[in-house]
């Protein structure tokens, strides 16, 4: 799918480009990001994870690359939903850019692609992310036990979902 450029209140979402891979690889190596993503990603692995075929947006703030927002879209009529992953550079965290990016993309998927349900699954240990997603309207719906490796130990992840009429 060819992705559009989307504008939120404070962010611009645009398709990830080849030139973004090295800077985004650097973002994933920052301590506050790496603790949730595991080992540092080389550009080739990052390219695969960002699904360079069109399933990720670069997040820009004030003209600077701030991070990325990936998605998996379920298009089967019986199961329509979109799942998200997001990562912001340390210097862009805590200012509301993540929630703005998520709101912007949720609205686009609802308005342009007909989706009504969205999910995200942060580590249960990532309080900052859980609060940010709750600010958008995501609600906890379950715990995925021992879902991800964190500091060499299996940790639970919190499954959160959002119905379009709950978007804040």
What are these model-derived regions, one by one?
Residues 1-51, 166-168:
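A short, well-structured alpha-helix characteristic of acyl/acetyltransferase catalytic modules
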Residues 35-93, 108, 163-167:
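Acetyl-CoA-dependent GNAT
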Residues 64-67, 128, 154:
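Glycine-rich acetyl-CoA-binding "A-motif" of GNAT/NAT acetyltransferases
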Residues 94-108, 127-135:
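Conserved acetyl-CoA-binding loop-helix of GNAT-fold acetyltransferases
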Residues 112-121:
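Conserved GNAT acetyl-CoA-binding A-motif
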Residues 120-130, 147-151:
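Conserved beta-strand-loop-alpha-helix junction that forms the acyl-donor binding cleft
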Residues 133, 138, 160:
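Conserved active-site tyrosine of GNAT-family acetyltransferases
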């Amino acid at each position: 799918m060819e992705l559009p450029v989307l504008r939120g209140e404070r962010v611009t979402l645009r398709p990830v480009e080849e030139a973004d891979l090295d800077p985004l690889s650097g973002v994933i190596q920052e301590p506050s990001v790496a603790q949730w993503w595991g080992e540092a990603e080389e550009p080739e692995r990052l390219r695969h994870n960002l699904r360079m075929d069109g399933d990720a947006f670069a997040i820009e703030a004030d003209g600077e690359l701030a991070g990325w927002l990936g998605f998996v879209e379920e298009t089967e009529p019986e199961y329509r939903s979109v799942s998200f992953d997001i990562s912001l550079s340390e210097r862009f965290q805590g200012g509301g850019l993540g929630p703005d990016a998520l709101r912007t993309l949720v609205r686009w998927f609802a308005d342009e692609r007909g989706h009504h349900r969205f999910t995200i699954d942060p580590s249960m240990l990532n309080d900052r992310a859980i609060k940010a997603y709750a600010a958008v309207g995501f609600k906890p719906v379950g715990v995925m036990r021992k879902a991800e490796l964190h500091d060499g130990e299996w940790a639970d992840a919190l499954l959160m979902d959002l119905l379009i009429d709950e978007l804040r």
